[in-house]
Design a protein with these regions (language model features):
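Scaffold signal of the M16-like zinc-metallopeptidase fold and its non-catalytic homologs
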Residues: 162-212, 233, 283, 313, ...
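M16/MPP (pitrilysin/insulinase) zinc-metallopeptidase core fold and M16-derived inactive scaffolds
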Residues: 59-124, 164, 187-188, 295-309
Length: 442
């Protein structure tokens, strides 16, 4: 949180120059000598050897995400994987939980738009035993009807409660309108309807056909050797059916005009989230739009919150995916006034020029934030996975700094002109407080 605030403040101090600036910022990436990539039984594995701590983070990525789902099956993968914690062929429920507690390990499931992450956190000494439990959860979950029903009830309750949380509801609505007609419009967590209809037979069929090694990529960060990782993978998930899945980046969503969804709620404030589509992760514009969103965040913070006191929370998020997504977010009692300010600040970013000194300060802050955000082994695993899957090479992760430094003020201006348009909005609050024509002007 502190890093985010610092970054907003740096973005807010960037100045506008009346003339173009073509200064090129350069930086050299350090070669990553700690990381290697290899295949085990057809499963790509990335291993980063870290000896500074006793923690092993192993993230197994089940590739496909929302593209694996339909409106009828949304939530099936998460339900299956969470229900597997209730017992497997080798580890009945109570044995599994007792063993995990003794090991001090954790296995977490995080469904996403492009993949589901199954994260193992263990000590070096406990890694093999924890991995054995994970492997059995994938290969041989018991899926007892009573246990599945308990897990289902938990998730249905959580989905229902989404309607009671303005931010959660806003995010759900914003995704649905921003990605209309695209798989990203499906929530991998599922809906009340889809979760209610899924049966134990559905879960067993999904496990048999979709928990296959061709959908898997493993990233391990910790003090474990390649030989150890190869043995563990070969003797466990390497024996799963291969399947026919082949990873490729999703197709970008169709270009759609500005639009909006309004959900009436009686609340102390109003919530707005708009998204616009950005470039692919392999484009130089990717880093340029990332910085443009940071600049816009800083200026919105200064104008909306600091100078006009119209909101306690406002920003321009940048979402990392195979193709990027930028956005505009605010909670406010005066949405029309804030929308006017957002329009003004986007126009300023398109028409003006950031000074080289201002850009250098922003990039330096990004570098600091980057290293803070990748301190833990788990964070590093996710960083390597995004680089490998979105950009085609895990080594792109170590080039993040040099890619940021290569962006010029003109690149940021062009990114704002090219991508900060056709914003698709979700609004939760009092419809009388917002003018629809202001939403469609973006």
């Amino acid at each position: 949180m502190l890093a985010t605030v610092r970054l907003l403040l740096v973005g807010a101090t960037l100045l506008i120059s009346p003339l173009p600036v073509a200064a090129q910022f350069s930086g050299s990436a350090r070669e990553d000598t700690l990381t290697s990539q290899f295949d085990v039984a057809g499963i790509p594995v990335i291993l980063r050897r870290v000896t500074a701590n006793n923690v092993v983070a192993a993230n197994l990525y089940l590739l496909g995400g929302s593209r694996q789902l339909t409106p009828v099956t949304a939530g099936i993968e998460m339900l299956l994987l969470e229900a597997s914690e209730r017992g497997t062929a080798r580890y009945p429920r109570d044995v599994l939980r007792s063993k995990m507690a003794r090991l001090g390990s954790a296995i977490g499931v995080s469904p996403g738009a492009d993949w589901t992450t199954i994260g193992v956190r263990a000590t070096v000494a406990g890694f093999d035993s924890t991995w054995a439990i994970l492997s059995d959860r994938l290969a041989a979950p018991t899926l007892a009807a009573a246990e599945v029903e308990l897990v289902r009830e938990q998730f249905v309750t959580a989905v229902r409660q989404r309607k009671d949380s303005p931010d959660a509801l806003l995010e759900y609505l914003a995704d649905s309108i921003a990605f209309a007609g695209h798989p990203y419009a499906l929530d991998p967590v599922g809906t009340e309807e889809s979760l209610t209809r899924l049966t134990v037979a559905d879960l067993k069929a999904y496990q048999a056909t979709q928990i296959v090694s061709s959908r898997m990529m493993l990233v391990v960060v910790g003090n474990v050797s390649r030989a150890r990782v190869e043995r563990l993978v070969r003797e466990s998930i390497g024996r799963l059916p291969k399947g026919t899945y082949a990873w490729k980046a999703p197709a970008p969503p169709a270009s759609l005009p500005s639009a909006y969804l309004i959900e009436r709620r009686v609340l102390p404030t109003n919530y707005l989230q708009g998204y616009f589509h950005g470039p692919t992760a392999t484009s130089k514009d990717y880093a340029a739009l990332r910085l443009a969103c940071a600049v816009l965040s800083g200026r919105l913070f200064a104008e909306v919150r600091s100078r006009n006191n119209l909101s306690y929370s406002v920003n321009a998020p940048f979402v990392e995916r195979a193709f990027s997504v930028g956005g505009l977010y605010v909670t406010t009692t005066s949405p029309d006034r804030v929308l006017d300010i957002m329009q003004e600040q986007i126009k300023s970013l398109r028409d003006g020029y950031i000074t080289p000194d201002g850009l250098e300060r922003l990039v330096q802050q990004f570098i600091v934030t980057y290293f803070l955000d990748n301190e833990t082994n788990a964070d590093q695993a996710n960083m390597l996975a995004r680089a490998a899957l979105y950009q085609g090479d895990y080594r792109r992760a170590s080039r993040f700094v040099s890619e940021l430094r290569s962006i010029t003020p003109e690149d940021i201006r062009n990114a704002a002109r090219t991508y900060m348009t056709n914003v698709r909005w979700a609004y939760v609050g009092d419809p009388a407080k917002v003018t629809p024509s202001k939403l469609t002007k973006f």
